[in-house]
């Protein structure tokens, strides 16, 4: 059986081929009655307007790029992708994921973008743009939405981010309420030419520590040594543990930039004959699936919901609809399990 064509749909619906094209693309200059008639004819013939034809007629690619740092199969990145897809796919947009791991890959991506212009919008997750990159996006009129990015930069048309300062304030107040007076924050090394969301988290901890500082409270920021290739989580935890134990006075509580690093840190601390949480409390960040399995106390963020909100903002920008709140913050949630406790007692109760 021959594949149905737009001419077949036009004949069955009793309209022109141009009207079929406009109706199936959702153009506004088609009556609802005609649109329904055309759609019924298309359904009867199992006809679908090709995206390439639709793009040629509308001037749109019907494609949105999701640019993330790190690997696509990581918990946070896959969650954001799922949320973006849920919002964009039902209205006909393809979501094209791309990932970068260092500055050279980021520069290469942006050097190729103006030449291809193969997307209608771009969502950038968990890292900051450089001024030259933002200029490139503006030059090709590409709407830009950020996920977990600094909202004060002005480099994004819209954004949705976890409230890092609120999260770190919760963490500091929790640990202080449990009697801890020597609290550290542990993070991986971040190159000076990149600004990731985790670096915002480090600054948020420093700000929260300053805001909650009182006599007798000590805060420490511990960062891995500079390295070119990414460290494994176990190697990173080993290095951070060595830094913790080399302090003049060992902290009794540690906040960690991600759950994965926190879990590796707990394992390394126990190898050093330190009991968690009796000797040292550990608090992660993310509440990924692995955190529940490891019974890790942590701070929850919702990457799927972040992706959904980013997807909705993209659609509003593409439709030229006003955004009531272009830049939003997602509230974090403390999840207490069994890696935090009072300094003088057993483990904190599970959630």
PLM feature spans:
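An alpha-beta-alpha
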Residues: 169-212, 326-341
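Alpha-helical recognition/docking segments in bacterial nutrient-uptake
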Residues: 1-5, 62-173, 246-249
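Hydrophobic alpha-helical segments within soluble ligand-binding/sensing domains
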Residues: 160-186, 203, 207, 233-243, ...
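Short acidic capping loops at alpha-helix termini that bridge into adjacent secondary structure
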Residues: 181-182, 216-218, 276-282
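Short beta-strand segments enriched in small/hydrophobic residues
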Residues: 19, 56-72, 182-191
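Flexible loop/turn connectors
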Residues: 238, 242-351
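Short beta-strand elements in bilobed, periplasmic/extracellular small-molecule ligand-binding domains
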Residues: 88-100, 202, 206-234
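N-terminal helix-turn-helix DNA-binding module of bacterial transcription factors
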Residues: 1-61, 350-351
């Amino acid at each position: 059986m021959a594949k149905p064509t737009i001419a077949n749909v036009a004949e069955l619906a009793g309209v022109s081929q141009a009207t079929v094209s406009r109706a199936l693309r959702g153009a506004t200059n088609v009556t609802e009655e005609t649109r329904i008639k055309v759609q019924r004819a298309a359904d009867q013939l199992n006809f679908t307007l090709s995206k390439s034809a639709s793009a040629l007629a509308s001037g749109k690619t019907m494609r949105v790029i999701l640019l993330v740092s790190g690997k696509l199969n990581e918990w946070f990145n896959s969650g954001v992708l799922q949320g973006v897809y849920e919002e964009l796919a039902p209205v006909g947009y393809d979501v094209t994921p791309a990932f970068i791991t260092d500055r050279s890959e980021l520069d290469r991506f942006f050097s190729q973008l103006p030449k291809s212009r193969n997307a209608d919008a771009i969502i950038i997750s968990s890292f900051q743009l450089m001024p030259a990159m933002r200029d490139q996006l503006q030059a090709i009129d590409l709407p830009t939405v950020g996920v977990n990015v600094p909202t004060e930069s002005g480099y994004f048309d819209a954004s949705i981010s976890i409230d890092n300062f609120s999260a770190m304030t919760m963490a500091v107040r929790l640990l202080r309420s449990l009697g801890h007076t020597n609290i550290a924050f542990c993070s991986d090394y971040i190159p000076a030419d990149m600004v990731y969301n985790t670096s915002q988290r480090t600054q948020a901890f420093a700000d929260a520590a300053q805001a909650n500082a009182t006599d007798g409270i000590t805060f420490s920021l511990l960062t891995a040594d500079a390295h070119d290739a990414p460290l494994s989580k176990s190697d990173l935890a080993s290095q951070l543990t060595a830094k913790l134990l080399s302090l003049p006075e060992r902290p009794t509580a540690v906040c960690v930039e991600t759950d994965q690093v926190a879990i590796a840190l707990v394992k390394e601390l126990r190898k050093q004959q330190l009991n968690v949480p009796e000797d040292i409390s550990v608090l992660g960040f993310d509440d990924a699936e692995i955190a529940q399995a490891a019974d890790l106390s942590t701070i929850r963020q919702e990457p799927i919901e972040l992706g959904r909100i980013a997807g909705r903002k993209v659609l509003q920008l593409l439709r030229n609809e006003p955004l009531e709140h272009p830049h939003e913050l997602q509230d974090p949630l403390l999840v207490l399990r069994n890696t935090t406790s009072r300094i003088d007692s057993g483990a904190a109760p599970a959630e």
